[in-house]
A protein has these predicted regions:
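Short pre-active-site segment immediately N-terminal to the catalytic Zn-binding motif
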Residues: 135-153, 184-188
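Acidic helix-start/capping segments at beta-turn-to-alpha-helix junctions
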Residues: 61-69, 73-82, 89-113, 179-180, ...
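Pan-zinc metallopeptidase signature
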Residues: 228-280
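Active-site recognition of the HExxH zinc-binding catalytic motif
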Residues: 84, 131, 153-166, 196-197, ...
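Catalytic zinc-binding patch centered on the HExxH motif and its immediate surroundings
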Residues: 106-132
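Short helix/loop segments within enzyme catalytic domains
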Residues: 74-95, 187, 191-234
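Catalytic Zn2+-binding segment of zinc metalloproteases
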Residues: 159-174, 208
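Long amphipathic alpha-helical segments used for membrane anchoring, targeting, substrate engagement
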Residues: 1-62
């Protein structure tokens, strides 16, 4: 991706080196929403807690490589701001830009405390995306999804959850919690995640029109989408898959919805909720 020398976002909060507090306790209040909207990408939602410890300032000096990733995700966030402001404007709506919070080890959010192993996530309580930049290496090494555009896909996917929050989609799914069987509820969660993949594809569609993509970028995004499919993660972790427990979609589904958004570049074709399981 052509990103160096381009505008970065002013909506980045750097909390690297700050203590996020102890991990423990239970989730309550708005923290429950995070089960619906945050993206595991290999993480564990039970790590999120309802604790509200004080965050302490520490002097933090990252490596040159880490700072380059920080600069990169800031440019990606700026691109999402340009794209979604334009898309929302086309539909007669105003886009409220989210904040990207960079952290190390653990972080306090309005949805509770999260550790790095949670993976990148979006918290609707403060309309913020949270990313530990060590995930860039994890994406490459653990998930075998290298490349800067793989990380760009992750950021764009989390922004996709913010779009869902603004459009009210995530709340509609949240309201079903406890009202339907768990297996059925998982199907709604899966559609929420696949729609976020679609929105990430919409962003990539516009970025291509801006002539910021390089050869191989889309392949990197598709590889990342495939790497975080429920079937692939479960197979690697336990040697078998349990389809009724899927909450993010299979590798093929995640690839398909990202690419569908990339080709369409609009909101209309991203309604995952009107389709049957076989149509996903």
């Amino acid at each position: 991706m052509k990103w160096k020398g381009r505008k970065s976002s002013s909506n980045v909060e750097d909390r690297r080196g700050m203590s996020g507090g102890m991990i423990g306790g239970g989730i309550g209040g708005v923290g429950l929403i995070i089960y619906l909207i945050f993206t595991l990408l290999g993480g564990d939602p039970s790590i999120l807690t309802g604790n509200t410890p004080n965050q302490q300032n520490n002097t933090y000096t990252g490596t040159t490589e880490e700072q380059e990733v920080a600069d990169f995700v800031s440019v990606v966030l700026a691109d999402t701001e340009v794209v979604w402001n334009e898309v929302f404007n086309e539909y007669g709506m105003d886009y409220e830009e989210p904040t990207l919070v960079l952290f190390t080890n653990s972080v306090q959010s309005a949805c509770g405390v999260a550790g790095s192993s949670t993976g990148p996530f979006y918290c609707p309580g403060d309309q913020s995306l949270y990313i530990d930049l060590s995930f860039y290496d994890e994406l490459s090494e653990k998930f075998q999804a290298p490349g800067d555009f793989a990380m760009a896909y992750v950021v764009a996917h989390e922004v996709g959850h913010h779009v869902q929050y603004l459009l009210g989609t995530s709340k509609q799914v949240q309201d079903l919690r406890g009202k339907v069987a768990e297996t059925e509820y998982n199907r709604y969660l899966k559609r929420l995640e696949l729609q976020a993949d679609y929105y990430a594809g919409v962003w990539a569609h516009y970025v291509q029109d801006m002539d910021y993509l390089e050869e191989g970028d889309i392949e990197e995004a598709l590889n990342a989408a495939s790497a975080v499919g429920d079937d692939r993660i479960q197979e690697a972790a336990q040697g078998y898959v349990v389809p009724d427990s899927f909450t993010h979609g299979t590798s093929d589904q995640r690839i398909r919805w990202f690419y569908k958004g990339f080709e369409a570049g609009d909101l209309e074709n991203g309604d995952t909720f009107k389709l049957s399981e076989n149509e996903l």
